[in-house]
Amino acid sequence: MKIYFDNCSLQRPLDSKIQVRIAVEAEAVLGVLSLCESGQIELISSEALAFEISRSLSPDRVTWALEVLSRARVYVQVNDQIESRARLLVERGINPLDALHLASAEEARADYFCTCDDQLLRRGRSMTDLNTKVISPIELVGEVGQ
């Protein structure tokens, strides 16, 4: 099983846990990452993720994300095909960086694209032609636990 975490889901364990939803999502991400470490799940990284992470103003968040992604077995370099697919996704209402993430996940044949972004979840789920399932961290735990 291959999983692509977007930056917001990858960073969720570092967010303030004041809200129950955030705390539960953080634990879900950590649980799935532990399955990645044990080799039960294949983690995907990408040039788009590396770019987005590099823009963070928090050195702790950069260190955390790069450490997690160093365990990825697959690294997706942006190419013409990914850029073309991302442009189509942008035309359908996905923001440009999210579109690059989704196109990268499709290129890597990710089973799941995990995000905490409600708008991206809604839009991604409404697209019947995506080659990856857009899912929240909480839903992902349910899927990998089966």
Which residues make up each language-model segment?
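Acidic, PIN/NYN-like endoribonuclease modules and their adjacent C-terminal/linker elements
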Residues: 2, 16-26, 91-92, 106-146
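Alpha-helix capping/helix-boundary segments
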Residues: 9, 49, 82, 100-101, ...
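Short, basic, glycine/proline-bearing loop/turn elements
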Residues: 14-18, 81-90
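PIN/NYN-family metal-dependent endoribonuclease catalytic core
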Residues: 4-57, 70, 75, 138-142
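Short, aromatic/basic amphipathic alpha-helical patches
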Residues: 59-68, 123-129
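Helix-adjacent hinge/juxtasegments
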Residues: 62-83, 87
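Short beta-strand scaffold positions
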Residues: 77, 96-99, 115
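Acidic, metal-coordinating catalytic cores used for nucleic-acid/nucleotide bond scission
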Residues: 51-55, 94, 118-120
